[in-house]
Design a protein with these regions (language model features):
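The feature captures the beta-strand-to-loop junction immediately N-terminal to the Walker
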Residues: 37-39
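Conserved ABC transporter NBD signature motif
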Residues: 53, 59-73
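Hydrophobic anchor residue at the start of the ABC signature
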Residues: 138
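Catalytic Walker B motif of ABC-type/P-loop ATPase nucleotide-binding domains
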Residues: 149-153
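ABC transporter nucleotide-binding domain
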Residues: 167-251
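Short, charged/small-residue-rich alpha-helical element at the C-terminal edge
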Residues: 220-289
Length: 289
């Protein structure tokens, strides 16, 4: 790994006696793209907040470029919730961020990133679609030319076309040496864009791996799905030891990629995840609730 630009050491966060982050340690090298995955409630957003100093860790240390605290002029953050002012036009928002950014992106560079139609720049931001708002919020983060990006569920609300455009921009940023840490529920995106994958589960860092290593593993997987997907299992050839209890159905497989593709084709979607429906990866277990 290249020289560490971010170092997290034994980070602990407790809230009202409950451990939210449990001794998290990892490093991110200059120019690396690191994905943080795990079910809702695993601690992804809290971890980012502690790294950025928005929340105070109970113990542990975070160093960015060897120093405590974030360098405001070098870091950009895309929050999980869009925070774009709704009563400004798109062109006005862009002009404002250009005004507060020294040597920022030009109007032409911004337009090349957004690929909006001419009339969309005249619209108020709240008139854009959810995906367009998300893309705009992301591009506004880039106007100051940060060298470190923190992105919390960056593609939430994006349609397929907008999401594809987003990852095209990410790939260009990677080529230019920008360091990126992002959280995601979209496993297919993680596999194609991340250099490393961190898996959080119940506040613990249970895996630090690479997409290649994750794909090459030939482990037996246990899959747990809501019982409403039980009829879909009849169409799956590569599963065994199927059991149904209460509101879930569980089975085993040695070909998780093929099985997951089939489930997606039958309507099982990661994008439907919420607090009660989430994707978790824990060792050899794939859990959808």
């Amino acid at each position: 790994m290249s020289e560490a630009i971010l170092q997290v050491t034994n980070l602990v966060k407790k809230i009202k006696g409950k451990t939210i982050l449990d001794h998290i340690s990892f490093e991110v090298g200059q120019g690396d793209c690191l994905a943080l995955i795990g079910p809702n409630g695993a601690g992804k957003t809290t971890l980012m907040s502690c790294i950025l100093g928005d929340k105070k860790a109970s113990s542990g240390q975070v160093l960015i470029k060897g120093k405590k605290g974030k360098a405001q002029d070098q870091i950009a953050v895309l929050l999980q919730e869009n925070t774009i002012p709704s009563q400004l036009r798109v062109k006005e928002l862009i002009a404002f961020f250009q005004d507060i950014s020294e040597n920022g992106l030009s109007k032409e560079e911004i337009q090349a990133l957004l690929q909006f139609k001419d009339d969309q720049y005249q619209q108020f931001a709240d008139k854009l679609s959810g995906g367009q708002k998300r893309l705009l919020a992301f591009v506004l983060c880039l106007i100051g030319k940060p060298d470190i990006l923190f992105l919390d569920e960056p593609t939430a609300g994006m349609d397929t076309t907008t999401r594809q455009r987003f990852w095209e921009i990410i790939n260009d940023l990677k080529k230019s040496g920008v360091t990126i840490l992002y959280s995601s529920h979209y496993i297919e995106e993680v596999e194609h864009t991340a250099d490393r994958i961190l898996v959080l589960h119940q506040g613990k860092l249970i895996r630090d791996t690479t997409p290649h290593a994750m794909r090459s593993e030939e482990k037996e997987k246990q899959v747990t799905l809501p019982s409403r997907f039980a009829p879909s299992l009849d169409k799956l050839a590569d599963i065994y030891d199927v059991t149904e209890k209460r509101d879930v159905v569980t089975f085993m497989t040695k070909d998780i990629e093929s099985v997951w593709s089939s489930l997606q084709a039958q309507g099982c979607r990661i994008s439907d995840i919420d607090n009660e429906n989430f994707l978790g990866l824990s060792g050899n277990c794939l859990l959808l609730r």
